[in-house]
């Protein structure tokens, strides 16, 4: 199990510095690949459409996932509901490259997340703080992402989650070794992972930004805050010129410390996706509150 998990973590490392794009069909997957995406996330509806439709959001149709797998050579990810291990079994049977146990879909289990150690395929999970990230890693997640607020086009929650994780890592790192057991209890995280953070000053897996990234500047902001890469959901294919915006976000993610390049790629991108002020969201509309 440990060898498999190490392999999965190494596989996830190969995505570092890249952009992963949500796509709903083979044509969009081809556009994403051509723009330089390191992977695509196959799903029937992007988060902004899931918000509008309401109801229960589930795993995508296997036929649609297979069509996208056939269309591109880059890795293909797909989402499952929190706790829905059978949806994960189905995706593994489809030879999916990565599974996202996602709060964007309607949770299937309000008590347990999936035991990811029972799968060969690597998992990515969302987290809004260090305790949540370490709990998911202890369950077998090979990659973490901020939760943000998907489908809003508003990066504020992704920024909040990244800053929270960074600040909590600093707290653990600066603590004395004697304090670590108390901190592990406070964060609801395993002691061995708290010890890793204390000794290394980082998560044991890569951490991507997700939720609300809509512009090249948003992507660069998250990279400058310390993310290892970015997920872009509705921000590309809900804009007026998806191909151009996709290329621009990829370039801004690569050259995130060069304002000149970010300025150049931000010119004449057309209209960004329709956005939502996160402060207007309440209750079940706040996807980041799903999971624990």
Curated annotation (Swiss-Prot):
Organism domain of life: Bacteria
Biological process annotations from GO: amino acid metabolic process; pyridoxal phosphate biosynthetic process; pyridoxine biosynthetic process
Entry EC number(s): 4.3.3.6
Keywords: Lyase, Pyridoxal phosphate, Schiff base
Keyword Oxidoreductase tagged: no
Top-level EC class: lyase
Entry-linked Pfam families: SOR_SNZ
Annotated pathway: Cofactor biosynthesis; pyridoxal 5'-phosphate biosynthesis
InterPro entries referenced in this protein's UniProt entry, alphabetically: Aldolase_TIM, PdxS/SNZ, PdxS/SNZ_N, RibuloseP-bd_barrel
Single Gene Ontology MF annotation: pyridoxal 5'-phosphate synthase (glutamine hydrolysing) activity
Annotated D-glyceraldehyde 3-phosphate binding sites: 163
Reactions catalysed according to its record: aldehydo-D-ribose 5-phosphate + D-glyceraldehyde 3-phosphate + L-glutamine = pyridoxal 5'-phosphate + L-glutamate + phosphate + 3 H2O + H(+)
Residues annotated to bind D-ribose 5-phosphate: 22, 151, 212, 233-234
UniProt keyword Lyase present: yes
Catalytic residues in the record: 79 (schiff-base intermediate with d-ribose 5-phosphate)
HAMAP family the UniProt entry points to: PdxS (MF_01824)
Family: Belongs to the PdxS/SNZ family.
Subunit (UniProt): In the presence of PdxT, forms a dodecamer of heterodimers.
Job of this protein: Catalyzes the formation of pyridoxal 5'-phosphate from ribose 5-phosphate (RBP), glyceraldehyde 3-phosphate (G3P) and ammonia. The ammonia is provided by the PdxT subunit. Can also use ribulose 5-phosphate and dihydroxyacetone phosphate as substrates, resulting from enzyme-catalyzed isomerization of RBP and G3P, respectively.
Entry protein name: Pyridoxal 5'-phosphate synthase subunit PdxS
């Amino acid at each position: 199990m440990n060898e498999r998990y190490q392999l999965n973590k190494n596989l996830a490392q190969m995505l570092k510095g890249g952009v992963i794009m949500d796509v709903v069909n083979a044509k969009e997957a081809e556009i994403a690949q051509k723009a330089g995406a390191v992977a695509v996330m196959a799903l029937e509806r992007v988060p902004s459409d899931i918000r509008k439709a309401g109801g229960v959001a589930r795993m995508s149709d296997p036929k649609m996932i297979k069509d996208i797998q056939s269309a591109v050579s880059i890795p293909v990810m797909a989402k499952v509901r929190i706790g829905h291990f059978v949806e994960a079994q189905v995706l593994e049977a489809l030879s999916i490259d990565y599974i996202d146990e996602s709060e964007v879909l309607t949770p299937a289990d309000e008590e347990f997340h999936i035991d990811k150690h029972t799968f060969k395929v690597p998992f990515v999970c969302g987290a809004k703080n260090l305790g949540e990230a370490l709990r998911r890693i202890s369950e077998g997640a090979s990659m973490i992402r901020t939760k943000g607020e998907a489908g809003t086009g508003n990066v504020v929650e992704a920024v909040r989650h990244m800053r929270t994780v960074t600040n909590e890592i600093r707290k653990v790192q600066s603590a004395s070794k004697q304090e670590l057991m108390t901190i592990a209890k406070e964060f609801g995280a395993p002691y061995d992972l708290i010890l890793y953070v204390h000794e290394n000053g980082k998560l044991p897996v890569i951490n991507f930004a997700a939720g609300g990234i809509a512009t090249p500047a948003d992507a660069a902001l998250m990279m400058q805050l310390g993310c290892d890469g970015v997920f872009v959901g509705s921000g590309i294919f809900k804009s007026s010129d998806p191909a151009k915006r996709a290329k621009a976000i990829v370039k801004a993610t690569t050259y995130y410390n060069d304002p000149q390049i970010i300025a150049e790629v931000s010119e004449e991108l057309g209209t960004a996706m329709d956005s939502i002020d996160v402060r207007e969201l309440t209750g079940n509309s706040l996807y980041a509150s799903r999971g624990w």
